[in-house]
Protein backbone atom coordinates (compact mmCIF):
# COMPACT_ATOMS: atom_id res chain seq x y z
CA UNK A 1 0.00 0.00 0.00
CA UNK A 2 1.33 3.44 -0.93
CA UNK A 3 0.10 6.14 1.48
CA UNK A 4 1.02 9.81 0.92
CA UNK A 5 4.51 10.98 1.81
CA UNK A 6 3.90 13.16 4.84
CA UNK A 7 5.30 13.74 8.28
CA UNK A 8 1.85 13.12 9.71
CA UNK A 9 -1.17 11.35 8.28
CA UNK A 10 -4.63 12.70 9.06
CA UNK A 11 -7.06 10.61 11.09
CA UNK A 12 -8.98 9.65 7.96
CA UNK A 13 -5.80 8.65 6.12
CA UNK A 14 -4.82 6.47 9.08
CA UNK A 15 -8.26 4.91 8.99
CA UNK A 16 -7.78 4.03 5.32
CA UNK A 17 -4.43 2.39 6.07
CA UNK A 18 -5.81 0.40 9.02
CA UNK A 19 -8.87 -0.64 7.01
CA UNK A 20 -6.76 -1.90 4.10
CA UNK A 21 -4.64 -3.96 6.50
CA UNK A 22 -7.80 -5.37 8.10
CA UNK A 23 -9.43 -6.20 4.76
CA UNK A 24 -6.27 -7.86 3.41
CA UNK A 25 -5.91 -9.98 6.55
CA UNK A 26 -9.36 -11.46 5.92
CA UNK A 27 -7.92 -12.88 2.68
CA UNK A 28 -4.68 -13.97 4.39
CA UNK A 29 -2.60 -11.30 2.66
CA UNK A 30 0.07 -9.09 4.20
CA UNK A 31 0.40 -5.36 3.58
CA UNK A 32 3.67 -3.50 3.01
CA UNK A 33 3.44 0.25 3.66
CA UNK A 34 5.73 2.37 1.52
CA UNK A 35 5.33 6.14 0.96
CA UNK A 36 5.77 7.70 -2.45
CA UNK A 37 6.44 11.15 -3.84
CA UNK A 38 9.09 13.68 -2.95
CA UNK A 39 12.12 11.99 -1.40
CA UNK A 40 10.45 8.58 -1.58
CA UNK A 41 10.52 8.10 -5.36
CA UNK A 42 13.36 5.57 -5.10
CA UNK A 43 11.37 3.49 -2.61
CA UNK A 44 8.39 3.49 -4.98
CA UNK A 45 10.60 2.55 -7.92
CA UNK A 46 12.12 -0.37 -5.98
CA UNK A 47 8.65 -1.74 -5.38
CA UNK A 48 7.73 -1.43 -9.05
CA UNK A 49 10.93 -2.80 -10.60
CA UNK A 50 11.71 -5.36 -7.92
CA UNK A 51 8.24 -6.93 -7.95
CA UNK A 52 8.39 -7.06 -4.16
CA UNK A 53 4.59 -7.21 -3.95
CA UNK A 54 1.74 -8.89 -5.81
CA UNK A 55 -0.16 -5.62 -6.21
CA UNK A 56 -0.37 -1.99 -5.10
CA UNK A 57 -3.04 0.26 -3.57
CA UNK A 58 -2.32 3.95 -4.15
CA UNK A 59 -3.75 6.74 -1.97
CA UNK A 60 -4.12 10.52 -2.38
CA UNK A 61 -4.41 10.56 -6.16
CA UNK A 62 -3.60 13.58 -8.31
CA UNK A 63 -5.59 14.34 -11.46
CA UNK A 64 -2.37 13.76 -13.41
CA UNK A 65 -0.51 11.24 -11.29
CA UNK A 66 2.87 9.91 -12.52
CA UNK A 67 2.63 6.95 -10.12
CA UNK A 68 -0.43 5.70 -11.99
CA UNK A 69 1.38 6.03 -15.31
CA UNK A 70 4.41 4.18 -13.94
CA UNK A 71 2.38 1.27 -12.59
CA UNK A 72 0.43 1.02 -15.85
CA UNK A 73 3.68 0.83 -17.81
CA UNK A 74 5.08 -1.82 -15.46
CA UNK A 75 2.01 -4.03 -15.70
CA UNK A 76 1.84 -4.40 -11.92
CA UNK A 77 -1.73 -4.90 -10.62
CA UNK A 78 -2.91 -1.78 -8.77
CA UNK A 79 -5.99 0.00 -7.48
CA UNK A 80 -6.27 3.68 -6.64
CA UNK A 81 -8.28 5.16 -3.78
CA UNK A 82 -9.20 8.23 -5.77
CA UNK A 83 -8.94 8.51 -9.55
CA UNK A 84 -7.03 10.49 -12.17
CA UNK A 85 -8.71 12.94 -14.52
CA UNK A 86 -8.90 10.42 -17.36
CA UNK A 87 -8.91 6.99 -15.67
CA UNK A 88 -9.63 5.01 -18.83
CA UNK A 89 -9.45 1.26 -18.28
CA UNK A 90 -8.22 1.28 -14.69
CA UNK A 91 -9.30 0.03 -11.29
CA UNK A 92 -10.30 2.59 -8.67
CA UNK A 93 -12.55 3.49 -5.74
CA UNK A 94 -13.57 7.05 -4.94
CA UNK A 95 -16.15 9.33 -3.38
CA UNK A 96 -18.05 11.68 -5.69
CA UNK A 97 -16.64 14.86 -4.18
CA UNK A 98 -17.98 17.13 -6.91
CA UNK A 99 -21.49 15.75 -6.59
CA UNK A 100 -21.53 15.70 -2.79
CA UNK A 101 -20.15 19.23 -2.39
CA UNK A 102 -22.67 20.42 -4.96
CA UNK A 103 -25.46 18.89 -2.87
CA UNK A 104 -24.10 20.61 0.25
CA UNK A 105 -24.23 23.96 -1.54
CA UNK A 106 -27.79 23.35 -2.72
CA UNK A 107 -28.76 22.42 0.85
CA UNK A 108 -27.39 25.75 2.09
CA UNK A 109 -29.11 27.63 -0.72
CA UNK A 110 -32.42 25.99 0.20
CA UNK A 111 -31.91 27.35 3.73
CA UNK A 112 -31.55 30.88 2.36
CA UNK A 113 -27.77 31.31 2.49
CA UNK A 114 -26.50 33.60 -0.25
CA UNK A 115 -22.82 34.08 0.67
CA UNK A 116 -20.83 30.87 1.14
CA UNK A 117 -17.23 29.68 1.32
CA UNK A 118 -15.41 26.41 0.63
CA UNK A 119 -12.69 25.56 3.17
CA UNK A 120 -10.51 23.42 0.94
CA UNK A 121 -7.27 21.49 1.46
CA UNK A 122 -3.80 23.08 1.45
CA UNK A 123 -2.31 25.34 -1.24
CA UNK A 124 0.30 22.65 -1.92
CA UNK A 125 -2.27 19.93 -2.56
CA UNK A 126 -4.38 22.16 -4.79
CA UNK A 127 -1.32 23.24 -6.78
CA UNK A 128 -0.26 19.60 -7.17
CA UNK A 129 -3.65 18.72 -8.66
CA UNK A 130 -5.04 16.72 -5.73
CA UNK A 131 -8.24 15.12 -7.01
CA UNK A 132 -10.69 15.66 -4.11
CA UNK A 133 -9.67 19.32 -3.72
CA UNK A 134 -10.11 20.19 -7.39
CA UNK A 135 -13.30 18.18 -7.84
CA UNK A 136 -14.77 19.76 -4.70
CA UNK A 137 -13.91 23.20 -6.05
CA UNK A 138 -15.61 22.42 -9.35
CA UNK A 139 -18.76 21.10 -7.66
CA UNK A 140 -18.84 24.04 -5.25
CA UNK A 141 -18.49 26.74 -7.90
CA UNK A 142 -20.90 25.07 -10.30
CA UNK A 143 -23.65 24.70 -7.70
CA UNK A 144 -23.10 28.22 -6.35
CA UNK A 145 -23.33 29.61 -9.87
CA UNK A 146 -26.51 27.69 -10.60
CA UNK A 147 -28.14 29.04 -7.44
CA UNK A 148 -26.85 32.59 -7.83
CA UNK A 149 -24.73 32.53 -4.66
CA UNK A 150 -21.67 34.62 -3.87
CA UNK A 151 -18.95 32.01 -3.37
CA UNK A 152 -15.33 31.97 -2.22
CA UNK A 153 -12.79 29.13 -2.22
CA UNK A 154 -9.97 29.21 0.35
CA UNK A 155 -7.11 26.79 0.90
CA UNK A 156 -6.29 25.60 4.40
CA UNK A 157 -3.49 23.39 5.68
CA UNK A 158 -4.39 20.11 7.37
CA UNK A 159 -4.14 21.09 11.02
CA UNK A 160 -6.21 22.86 13.71
CA UNK A 161 -4.05 25.99 13.85
CA UNK A 162 -4.55 26.50 10.13
CA UNK A 163 -8.29 25.97 10.54
CA UNK A 164 -8.43 28.71 13.18
CA UNK A 165 -6.41 31.15 11.07
CA UNK A 166 -8.35 30.30 7.92
CA UNK A 167 -11.74 30.94 9.49
CA UNK A 168 -10.59 34.22 11.02
CA UNK A 169 -9.32 35.27 7.59
CA UNK A 170 -12.70 34.42 6.09
CA UNK A 171 -14.48 36.57 8.68
CA UNK A 172 -12.12 39.48 8.05
CA UNK A 173 -12.25 39.36 4.26
CA UNK A 174 -15.88 38.43 3.76
CA UNK A 175 -17.97 39.36 6.80
CA UNK A 176 -21.15 38.60 4.87
CA UNK A 177 -20.40 34.87 4.66
CA UNK A 178 -23.05 32.93 6.60
CA UNK A 179 -22.13 29.34 5.74
CA UNK A 180 -19.14 27.16 4.92
CA UNK A 181 -18.59 23.85 3.16
CA UNK A 182 -15.43 21.83 3.85
CA UNK A 183 -13.52 18.66 3.00
CA UNK A 184 -10.72 19.44 5.48
CA UNK A 185 -11.40 17.27 8.53
CA UNK A 186 -8.01 17.99 10.12
CA UNK A 187 -8.77 21.72 10.28
CA UNK A 188 -12.15 21.28 11.98
CA UNK A 189 -10.98 21.68 15.61
CA UNK A 190 -9.49 25.04 14.70
CA UNK A 191 -12.64 26.09 12.87
CA UNK A 192 -14.64 25.20 15.97
CA UNK A 193 -12.37 27.34 18.15
CA UNK A 194 -12.70 30.24 15.72
CA UNK A 195 -16.49 29.99 15.79
CA UNK A 196 -16.43 30.06 19.58
CA UNK A 197 -13.98 32.97 19.64
CA UNK A 198 -16.22 34.95 17.27
CA UNK A 199 -19.30 34.10 19.39
CA UNK A 200 -21.00 32.63 16.33
CA UNK A 201 -23.74 30.22 17.33
CA UNK A 202 -24.04 27.20 15.02
CA UNK A 203 -26.43 26.97 13.24
CA UNK A 204 -28.33 30.12 14.30
CA UNK A 205 -25.59 32.55 13.23
CA UNK A 206 -23.46 30.34 10.98
CA UNK A 207 -23.93 27.04 9.14
CA UNK A 208 -21.25 24.45 8.42
CA UNK A 209 -21.42 21.30 6.28
CA UNK A 210 -19.26 19.22 3.96
CA UNK A 211 -17.78 15.81 3.21
CA UNK A 212 -16.42 14.59 6.54
CA UNK A 213 -16.08 11.09 8.05
CA UNK A 214 -19.09 10.28 10.23
CA UNK A 215 -17.17 9.85 13.47
CA UNK A 216 -15.51 13.26 13.05
CA UNK A 217 -18.78 14.92 12.09
CA UNK A 218 -20.41 13.49 15.20
CA UNK A 219 -17.55 14.72 17.42
CA UNK A 220 -18.03 18.31 16.28
CA UNK A 221 -20.23 20.62 18.37
CA UNK A 222 -22.92 20.75 17.29
CA UNK A 223 -22.75 17.54 15.20
CA UNK A 224 -22.10 18.33 11.55
CA UNK A 225 -24.54 17.88 8.74
CA UNK A 226 -22.23 16.04 6.34
CA UNK A 227 -21.68 13.27 3.83
CA UNK A 228 -19.49 10.44 5.11
CA UNK A 229 -16.08 9.38 3.79
CA UNK A 230 -16.62 5.61 4.21
CA UNK A 231 -12.99 4.59 4.67
CA UNK A 232 -13.67 0.99 5.69
CA UNK A 233 -16.01 0.37 2.76
CA UNK A 234 -13.60 1.98 0.31
CA UNK A 235 -10.64 0.02 1.68
CA UNK A 236 -12.56 -3.24 1.46
CA UNK A 237 -13.56 -2.50 -2.14
CA UNK A 238 -9.97 -1.59 -3.04
CA UNK A 239 -8.64 -4.85 -1.62
CA UNK A 240 -11.36 -6.86 -3.38
CA UNK A 241 -10.60 -5.20 -6.72
CA UNK A 242 -6.87 -5.74 -6.31
CA UNK A 243 -7.28 -9.43 -5.48
CA UNK A 244 -9.58 -9.81 -8.48
CA UNK A 245 -6.80 -8.46 -10.70
CA UNK A 246 -4.15 -10.63 -9.11
CA UNK A 247 -6.26 -13.77 -9.46
CA UNK A 248 -7.40 -12.96 -13.01
CA UNK A 249 -5.02 -10.68 -14.94
CA UNK A 250 -7.42 -10.66 -17.89
CA UNK A 251 -10.36 -9.36 -15.83
CA UNK A 252 -12.16 -6.28 -17.14
CA UNK A 253 -11.21 -3.20 -15.08
CA UNK A 254 -13.89 -2.02 -12.66
CA UNK A 255 -14.40 0.98 -10.44
CA UNK A 256 -16.75 2.26 -7.73
CA UNK A 257 -17.80 5.91 -7.34
CA UNK A 258 -19.56 6.18 -3.99
CA UNK A 259 -22.23 8.77 -3.22
CA UNK A 260 -22.95 8.63 0.53
CA UNK A 261 -26.10 10.33 1.72
CA UNK A 262 -25.82 13.68 3.47
CA UNK A 263 -26.78 13.06 7.09
CA UNK A 264 -28.75 15.98 8.53
CA UNK A 265 -27.46 16.69 12.02
CA UNK A 266 -27.36 20.04 13.83
CA UNK A 267 -24.89 22.35 12.08
CA UNK A 268 -27.03 23.86 9.32
CA UNK A 269 -30.01 26.15 9.66
CA UNK A 270 -31.89 28.97 8.00
CA UNK A 271 -30.01 32.19 7.34
CA UNK A 272 -30.96 34.97 9.73
CA UNK A 273 -30.65 38.66 9.08
Please report, for each region that a protein language model flagged, where it lies by residue:
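Alpha-helical recognition/docking segments in bacterial nutrient-uptake
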Residues: 1-106
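Hinge/beta->alpha junction and helix N-cap segments in small-molecule ligand-binding domains
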Residues: 4-13, 35-40, 93-103, 119-166, ...
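Alpha-helical structural signal in soluble globular domains
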Residues: 19-23, 70, 135-147, 169, ...
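Residue-level detector of anion-binding/catalytic polar loops
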Residues: 29-30, 77, 114, 150, ...
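Glycine-rich phosphate-binding loop signature in dinucleotide/nucleotide-binding domains
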Residues: 50, 111-113, 170-176
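Periplasmic-binding protein-like
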Residues: 53-59, 117-119, 153-154, 174-184, ...
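Flexible loop/turn connectors
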Residues: 173-273
Amino acid sequence: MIPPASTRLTDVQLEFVASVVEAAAVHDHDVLLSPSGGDHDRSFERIVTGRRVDGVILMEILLADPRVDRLSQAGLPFVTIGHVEHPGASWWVDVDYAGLISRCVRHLADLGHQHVVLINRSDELVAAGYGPALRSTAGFLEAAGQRGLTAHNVCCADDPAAGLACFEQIRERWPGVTAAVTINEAALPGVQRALHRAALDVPRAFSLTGVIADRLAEDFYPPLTAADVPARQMARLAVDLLLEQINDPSATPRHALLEPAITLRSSTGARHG
